[in-house]
């Protein structure tokens, strides 16, 4: 274990840099943050995959964000977790320099890439991990692949990302029992994701797959198909995860509301460096994305106060 520690509001945060495990601790019965612990940060809208469910409408000629000029990033506290994505973040011409600067400031950088790009750029990504420029690698599932399993097994902090509604049980079964970690994301009805969902045949398929996964998820967890099974807040809601956990388990594992249903108690947010906007999460519609401010505390408190009104 390789824990780092800092204080956020009325509690202490402990992060194991080796496993990615995070622990919040205080002697009270509630956590009150005063800044972000983690941030989804979109650095480019460029991607050649053309995924029909893409909630960012990324395209091959999508713009890159300015990630090197002075900004709020210069004032983030050490050990802030950055989940770097896009688009395809590997396309950004300044990503190497950006990661070096983040390491100097002791940020914990994780990167999310499509399965195809992960396999094609494995050596580059593995080098980032070996040099502690990147700690975690999220791999967005595309199709079942023995090659994918083989490469992910060489990066202990790699996590398979799948989308409820698009992932099928047979695909999960293929990837299971290979010492992998998995993150299940909720289906986002945003931009192309909304268009896809509104297609009648896809609408029925997505709902069927969500219903199927909701039924089998307790067995997937109990039978240890994956070393770690985690969820974003949207998947927690769509799959009714709270219903399969005891109250003690829920209180132990749940990291807080992200503002989808009003209240925001999590210490996270979304930043679009391409459009220079921030929001409570990446599900936020255009009218709930706001112009970047000079420091992250102001942005976090703006979102927190707005969502708690």
For the regions a protein language model found, what residue spans apply to each?
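Residue-level recognition of short loop/turn positions
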Residues: 50, 86, 274-275
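Cysteine/selenocysteine-centered motifs that mediate thiol-based redox chemistry or coordinate metal-sulfur cofactors
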Residues: 300-309
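Canonical Radical SAM [4Fe-4S] cluster-binding loop centered on the CxxxCxxC motif
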Residues: 28-68
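Short amphipathic alpha-helix with an adjacent loop that forms part of the alpha/beta core around
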Residues: 73-75, 122-129, 172-173
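Radical SAM enzyme [4Fe-4S]-AdoMet core and its adjacent flexible, acidic
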Residues: 132-298
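Alpha-helical scaffolding segments of alpha/beta enzyme cores, especially the outer helices
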Residues: 71, 94-104, 127, 150, ...
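N-terminal [4Fe-4S]-dependent radical SAM core
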Residues: 1-40, 250-252
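Core AdoMet radical
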Residues: 38, 57-67, 79-92, 102-121, ...
């Amino acid at each position: 274990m390789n824990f780092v520690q800092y204080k956020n509001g009325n509690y202490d945060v402990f992060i194991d840099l080796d496993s990615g495990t995070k622990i919040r601790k205080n002697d009270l019965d509630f956590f009150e943050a005063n800044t972000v612990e983690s941030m989804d940060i979109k650095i480019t809208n460029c991607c050649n995959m053309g995924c029909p469910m893409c909630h960012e409408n990324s395209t091959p000629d999508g713009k890159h964000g300015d990630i090197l000029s002075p900004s709020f990033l210069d004032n983030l506290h050490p050990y802030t977790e950055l989940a770097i994505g896009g688009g395809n973040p590997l396309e950004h011409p300044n990503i190497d320099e950006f990661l070096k600067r983040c390491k100097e400031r002791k940020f914990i950088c994780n990167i999310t890439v499509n399965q195809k790009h992960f396999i094609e750029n494995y050596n580059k990504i593995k080098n980032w991990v070996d040099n502690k420029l990147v700690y975690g690698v999220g791999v967005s599932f595309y199709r079942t692949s023995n090659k994918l399993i083989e490469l992910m097994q060489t990066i202990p902090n790699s996590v398979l990302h799948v989308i409820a509604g698009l992932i099928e049980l047979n695909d999960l079964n293929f990837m299971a029992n290979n010492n992998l970690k998995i993150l299940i994301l909720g289906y986002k009805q945003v931009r192309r994701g909304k268009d896809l969902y509104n297609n009648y045949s896809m609408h029925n398929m997505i709902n069927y797959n969500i219903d199927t996964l909701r039924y089998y998820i307790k067995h997937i967890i109990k039978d240890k198909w994956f070393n770690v099974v985690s969820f974003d807040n949207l998947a927690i809601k769509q799959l009714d995860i709270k219903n399969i956990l005891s109250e003690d388990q829920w209180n132990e594992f749940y990291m807080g509301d992200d503002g989808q249903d009003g209240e925001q108690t999590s210490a996270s947010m979304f930043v679009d460096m391409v459009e220079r906007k921030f929001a409570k999460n990446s599900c936020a519609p255009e009218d709930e994305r706001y112009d970047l401010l000079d420091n992250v505390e102001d942005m976090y408190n703006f979102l927190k106060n707005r969502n708690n009104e």
